[in-house]
């Protein structure tokens, strides 16, 4: 029987990975560590798909970590994620449990599964000024020239792209110091969802979250003093809803552009996960359409080495 330190559940948006991870954690009497870069933030709930109800299974609350740990407007980074992941991981292991890591942010997942040695990167005003007038397309092309560590799935705004280039430039000049990060042997389970079903679920989920008050959530964040630029930085829902709230898009334009952007994002997530396989990770894929009991049985079999 393989000796795993961790179970990782990954998959694109709307694949049902969170209810799957919660049901598995319930079965194994363990806890979940979040690996979604935007669910880190308090008050950013509907826009990040933070379905906290998923963390209750058969009336039992499943403990979760790294959700609601930073204020909106803050630029949380992968260096901090590694640090916070380790604290959560060790606290779960001390209870004698096998942690479940769940999310779709490829860079966060890979940073802990591979144990990248990272360090905080300061802002570079000169570089920012030089890149300020470039389009997102031009910045993406610049970013492609690096042997990049950066998560291209999240580079969907000019600010994010400039920050990604800033990080790459810094690492090019400053050798990364050795920093201890434990080698983790994770069983990695990928949730495979049919493309058309994924598209249908994304659209249905978007309409549902808009009905539940996603626009009001963005308005509330701006009323709390979060600048439109800071919200746009988070991309996807926050980018397009903010543009609608400040009058730059009509409701119809916002919906159409956001729907398209989420579909593209899910496609980029799958590209990242396939890239992980090329980089040496073994991902055991399970169909999103299987009944929950069968998905859990699949994981239990893999844990036993079958």
Name what the model sees in each region:
Residues 1-306:
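Phosphate/pyrophosphate-binding catalytic cores of soluble transferases and nucleic-acid-acting enzymes
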């Amino acid at each position: 029987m393989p000796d795993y330190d961790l179970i990782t559940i990954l998959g694109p948006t709307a694949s049902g990975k969170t209810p799957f991870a919660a049901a598995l954690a319930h079965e194994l009497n363990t806890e979940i560590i979040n690996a979604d870069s935007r669910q880190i933030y308090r008050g950013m709930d509907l826009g990040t798909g933070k379905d906290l109800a998923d963390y209750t299974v058969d009336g039992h609350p499943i403990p979760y970590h790294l959700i609601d740990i930073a204020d909106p407007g803050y630029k949380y980074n992968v260096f901090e994620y590694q640090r916070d992941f380790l604290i959560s991981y060790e606290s779960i292991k001390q209870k004698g449990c096998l942690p479940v890591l769940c999310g779709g942010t490829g860079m966060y997942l890979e940073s802990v599964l591979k144990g990248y040695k990272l360090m905080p990167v300061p802002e570079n005003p000169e570089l920012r000024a030089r890149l300020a007038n470039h389009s997102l397309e031009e910045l993406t092309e610049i970013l492609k020239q690096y042997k990049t560590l950066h998560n291209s799935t999240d580079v969907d705004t000019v600010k994010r792209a400039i920050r990604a280039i800033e990080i790459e430039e810094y690492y090019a000049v400053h050798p990364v110091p050795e920093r201890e990060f434990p080698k983790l042997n994770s069983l990695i389970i990928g949730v495979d969802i049919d493309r058309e079903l994924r598209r249908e679920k994304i659209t249905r989920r978007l309409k549902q979250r808009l009905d539940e008050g996603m626009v009001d959530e963005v308005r509330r964040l701006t009323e709390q003093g979060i600048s439109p630029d800071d919200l746009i930085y988070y991309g996807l829902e926050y980018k397009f809803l903010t543009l609608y709230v400040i009058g730059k898009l009509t409701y119809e334009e916002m919906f159409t552009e956001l729907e398209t952007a989420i579909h593209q994002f899910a496609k980029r997530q799958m590209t990242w996960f396939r890239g992980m396989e090329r980089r040496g990770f073994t991902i055991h894929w399970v169909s999103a359409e299987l009944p929950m009991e069968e998905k859990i049985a699949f994981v239990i079999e893999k844990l036993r080495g079958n």
